[in-house]
Amino acid sequence: GPVMTRALTHLDNCYFIKSLKAIGYVCKTNTVSNTAFRGFGGPQGMLTIENILYSVSQYLQKPIDEIRKINYYSKLNGLKTPYGQIVKNLRIDRILDEVYKLSDYKNRLRNINKFNLNQKANNLPFRKGIALMPAKFGISFNKPSLNQGGALVHVYSDGSIRLNHGGTEMGQGLFIKVAQVVAECFKVPLEQIHITSTNTAEVPNTSATAASSGSDLNGMAAWNASNVIKNRMIDHAAKLFKKNKKDIVLGEGRIICGNRSLSFSELAFSCWENRISLSSTGYYKTPKISWDQGKLRGHPYFYFTWGAAISEALLDINTGESRILRADIVQDCGNSLNENIDIGQIEGGFIQGLGWLTCEELCFSKEGKL
C-alpha cells in the first residue's frame, strides 16, 4: 500500500546506503481499521534507520552524530537512493550548520552533561538530554497517476477574479497560497481574488490533498489557467496601445506601456466589450516522475525537502515524566509562498510528532476492543 511504500522509500532518510534490501508486510489485524495521518509512513521509515544508527553508535561507543556525519548523502559517499533515484537538491550540510548554530548545541551539551553529573552525584531524579533529528522527505505521491491538479479561473468585467481548484482547505492555508499564485500572475492585490469551495462539478477528477503536494499541484494548475487569460489580456492591451505585447508590463493592479497605463479592471472591461474570453481551465502534472511498484524502483519524488531539529528534554527517572524544554528547527522550504503559513506547518508538525512519540497510544484488549 501507499503508506508502506513511503515507509520503505524513507528508510534511508538522509543517509547514503550502498546496499539495502527492505521488505514491507501489510497485515490484517483484529483491531479497528486505521491509517496514517501526518507523514504517511515517512516518519516510521526514518525512525527505523535512526534506531539502526543508534545501535551502531552504542556498539562502537561513539557519538551518534559522528556516525550520522560519515553516512550523509554527499558527492563523496554517493547520491543514489536504495530505490534508484538520484538526490539532486542536496541541502543537509547547510541545514546542519544552521541548526547547530541556532541551537548553540555544543555549549548546551556541555551544560547538560554537567547538570546530569550533578543530579547523579546528589542522588536527584532529573536528567536532561539533547538530540538531533535530520529528515529528508520526498515530495509527490508514490503513485504517479495521483500527481495531477486542475483549476478554473474567471476574470470578471469589473476586474474581480474567481478561483476554484482541486485542493481541499483543512486549515493548512492552501487556499491562501493558491490565491497568492493567481494574484502574482495577474499582478493584482490578493483581496481581488475570490476563492470558491472545492467542487468536482467545477474541477473534476481531483487528487487527494496530501503528500505535501497540494500547493505544487493546484498552485501550478491555477498559474497555468491564469497565464492563459493574462496572455489574452496582454494581446488586447497591445492592440489598444498600438504597441508590441513585449512592451506591456503588469504591476500593482495596472497594465503599463511606456507612460500610458490602464487599471486591471479597465482592461478587463475592455476585453469583455471586445468579446475576449476571460475564463480558462488549468492543468498540471508533475514532470519527471516514474515508479515501478513491483520492483520498488524508479524516480517517485519530484524533489526532496530537508530539515533538522535539535530538541532538549527533561526527564524524571523516578516517574518517567518528561518535558520538552526547547526545540530548534531548520526546514528548507525553497522560495516560500507564505512564510507565516509554512512556519505554522513546521511548528504544528513538530508538536504532532511529539504527541505521537510521547503520549498518544491506543490500547486494545486481546479481543481487539479499544
What residue spans do the PLM features occupy?
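Short, solvent-exposed positions on alpha-helices
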Residues: D65-E66
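Gly/Pro-rich active-site capping loops and adjacent beta-alpha segments
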Residues: G1-G45, L117-L370
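Acidic-enriched catalytic cores of C-N bond-cleaving enzymes acting on peptides and small amides
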Residues: Q58, K62
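Accessory "access/gating" subregions that flank catalytic or transport cores
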Residues: K69-H154
